[in-house]
Amino acid sequence: MNALVVGATGLCGAAILKHAAEATSFNKVYALVRRQIPNSAARVETIVNEQSDSWPESVPAGVDVFFSGLGTTRANAGGLENQYKVDHDLNIAVAKAAKERGCRVCVIVSAIGASVNARLPYNKLKGDIERDLLALEFERTVILRPGVLLGERETHHKGFGNSVAVFLGKLVYRGRFQALLGYPVYGDEVGQVAVALALSDDKSKVRIVESAEILSLVKQENTQ
């Protein structure tokens, strides 16, 4: 079984790559990136393509599971339109290419509050991604909706609001007030659950996992 990871330099994508590389169920784990990344795992093969617009053409055949932790912020992208091109357009284009090459399972990191009817642009963006991803009709689709994401990022996410949310998220993590921030979760926990669910015996065509369940699944995984 082979896997493809996009967004492998981001917080959740890097965690997915790490856990997928550790999973003996995968023979090979491809990481589609714009620049070379350091990784000593024997089963990881990096596909470097600086032109992300042509990423769909770089998707290898023989991939069974498509993982995406691909995403950016409006500030980092330089506006909502550019953010949409990365978060939505690129995700869907690569997922479609993977599906056309025989991929059966799709696991993507979305966000809490994702909805096509959301008033907030970010939540609507994530809702649009989920809608169009489901339209591709993979045999199995897993959508993870984490709350505030915690952990060390390779690149800084601009924006005062994001910094405040992370600061508060660390304070309430797994505490009595965690629900107020949508159950903050570490990127590594998201990656762990993404890989575990991709390899699970769950036959559900669509599974949506909210942040509270991500935390619960991590606890279950770590006590086995």
UniProtKB/Swiss-Prot annotation:
Boundaries of the annotated transit peptide in chain numbering: 1-44
SUPFAM superfamilies referenced in this protein's UniProt entry, alphabetically: NAD(P)-binding Rossmann-fold domains
InterPro entries: NAD(P)-bd_dom, NAD(P)-bd_dom_sf
Keyword presence, Lyase: no
Gene3D superfamilies hit by this protein: NAD(P)-binding Rossmann-like Domain (3.40.50.720)
Membrane protein topology class: Peripheral membrane protein
Family: Belongs to the FMP52 family.
Localization: Mitochondrion outer membrane
Protein name: Protein FMP52, mitochondrial
Pfam families the UniProt entry points to: NAD_binding_10
Annotated source species: Eremothecium gossypii (strain ATCC 10895 / CBS 109.51 / FGSC 9923 / NRRL Y-1056) (Yeast)
GO CC entries: cytoplasm; mitochondrial outer membrane
Biological process (GO), any one: import into nucleus
Higher taxonomy: Eukaryota, Fungi, Dikarya, Ascomycota, Saccharomycotina
Protein keywords: Membrane, Mitochondrion, Mitochondrion outer membrane, Transit peptide
Coiled-coil blocks: none
